[in-house]
Amino acid sequence: MGSSKSKPKDPSQRRRSLEPPDSTHHGGFPASQTPNKTAAPDTHRTPSRSFGTVATEPKLFGGFNTSDTVTSPQRAGALAGGVTTFVALYDYESRTETDLSFKKGERLQIVNNTEGDWWLAHSLTTGQTGYIPSNYVAPSDSIQAEEWYFGKITRRESERLLLNPENPRGTFLVRESETTKGAYCLSVSDFDNAKGLNVKHYKIRKLDSGGFYITSRTQFSSLQQLVAYYSKHADGLCHRLTNVCPTSKPQTQGLAKDAWEIPRESLRLEVKLGQGCFGEVWMGTWNGTTRVAIKTLKPGTMSPEAFLQEAQVMKKLRHEKLVQLYAVVSEEPIYIVTEYMSKGSLLDFLKGEMGKYLRLPQLVDMAAQIASGMAYVERMNYVHRDLRAANILVGENLVCKVADFGLARLIEDNEYTARQGAKFPIKWTAPEAALYGRFTIKSDVWSFGILLTELTTKGRVPYPGMVNREVLDQVERGYRMPCPPECPESLHDLMCQCWRKDPEERPTFEYLQAFLEDYFTSTEPQYQPGENL
């Protein structure tokens, strides 16, 4: 999808320039995570980075083929000068006999080339050689190697990280500016009695001579010098810089080098997390080393050949708000292996103990995260087909990710394919999709409007008191769900935009993301918490 700009007033046309596709994932279910990065199951809180690596095409498990890997776009520039020495940004524990364990701060020499998601490297500390995840390292002495540099994360994502109540005043990060190419932004947590915990953003401008400044009277030859100075003196900032913003370790891109079609024996199913019409979801371990989620499909649910073909597409979808597809067992019963999300499905989360404590700001933020993931799906010209709270997964710190995209198209069960059958999610489905099978990104937008009602009612089934057939008839006649109790009318208006009869008149996900991210500054600045919202 392009990024043509037009006035935000027309939501169906609004386009905003967002970061290019980088890390993305599929699948379905449980791990902690954070903005620009996915979180590993372990709980290390270390600064996140933003190095997107483009999907490679791993071969059958155990095979080696580097001919079809793709150079990481964000690293390519840094490596053009022949950089081969890198520094580890995080600890990494090897998962196979061919990869390399290392500790944060270790220096590593790249042996072959810096392409794809897994690089062959030699540790200058331990003297050992093996494959390393490329998003766990950065060129030595580069800005990317700094703990406080978070790269290409959005203003909203930086606020999500910095607004953690555990962060002291002055917690900070440096990121790329969203609005000025080549400039940076210093984001700092602050506190005052009027606003409470809040974040201030300072544009870091670049001098023609190569230096940097926030205010022209105080200039620095490097970002490192700028950070060191403001760590000692506030000098006009809201507070001096105190702590680097903590976040979780990112997910690796895939389980290991060439671990795509994996043997069933390499997986151990440990805790059953859920069960649906077409299979079960388990927490498990791959190769005795790595926490994963495993979706098992009942034999006959879909053709293994069709699934494998679709999975090749799904694994290339990488975004921090999509659950990452790690690997597959492609013979029946099909297993789908994904990152593990610790809090389970959004539907269960809303209906559970935590749901009672969620208020509109948290719910709107969760909706904005889902819209962000779907805006990426939109840009990639893909369609989800089954967007609802049951297919959104929740991690630590209310991180939400879209799961199970694309799978609905492959289901061969008659109770589903009839579209009016008992297993078909009719209450979430746009009328043109339910009646005529026209599934598009615009039918996903309709489903997102229904998902907004799930959020604002803490998991209530849509169209309460109505059966599927009745829903289809009533919606065709123009019926739309009323505004949920305590929900602002402005949010209900957004739902109704998603439910416009003409699919082309519905908003884009890009517009929905922008609207929801700015909701409490642009639309509802006077919001006051109520009993439930």
UniProtKB/Swiss-Prot annotation:
Binding-site positions, ATP: 273-281, 295
Keyword annotations: ATP-binding, Cell adhesion, Cell cycle, Cell junction, Cell membrane, Cytoplasm, Cytoskeleton, Endosome, Immunity, Kinase, Lipoprotein, Membrane, Mitochondrion, Mitochondrion inner membrane, Myristate, Nucleotide-binding, Nucleus, Phosphoprotein, Proto-oncogene, S-nitrosylation, SH2 domain, SH3 domain, Transferase, Tyrosine-protein kinase
Transcription found in the keyword field: no
SH2 domain: residues covered: 148-245
Region described as Disordered: 1-58
Domain Protein kinase: 267-520
Catalytic residue list: 386 (proton acceptor)
Tissues expressing the protein: Expressed to high levels, and with a high degree of kinase activity, in certain fully differentiated cells such as neurons, platelets and macrophages. Isoform 1 is widely expressed. Isoform 2 is expressed only in the muscle.
GO biological process, one term: negative regulation of intrinsic apoptotic signaling pathway
In-chain residues carrying the UniProt-annotated modification Phosphotyrosine: 416, 436, 527
Modification after translation, per record: Myristoylated at Gly-2, and this is essential for targeting to membranes.
The keyword Transmembrane helix appears for this protein: no
Main location: membrane
Activity regulation note: Becomes activated when its major tyrosine phosphorylation site is not phosphorylated. It can also be activated by point mutations as well as by truncations at the C-terminal end or by other mutations. Heme regulates its activity by enhancing the phosphorylation on Tyr-527.
Subcellular locations according to the entry: Cell membrane; Mitochondrion inner membrane; Endosome membrane; Nucleus
GO molecular function: ATP binding; connexin binding; heme binding; non-membrane spanning protein tyrosine kinase activity; protein phosphatase binding; protein tyrosine kinase activity; signaling receptor binding
Mode of membrane association: Lipid-anchor; Peripheral membrane protein
UniProt xrefs under InterPro entries: Kinase-like_dom_sf, Non-receptor_tyrosine_kinases, Prot_kinase_dom, Protein_kinase_ATP_BS, Ser-Thr/Tyr_kinase_cat_dom, SH2, SH2_dom_sf, SH3-like_dom_sf
Family per similarity comment: Belongs to the protein kinase superfamily. Tyr protein kinase family. SRC subfamily.
Subunit structure: Forms a complex with polyoma virus middle T antigen. Interacts with AFAP-110. Interacts with GJA1 and PXN.
Protein name (Swiss-Prot/TrEMBL): Proto-oncogene tyrosine-protein kinase Src
Gene that produces this protein: SRC
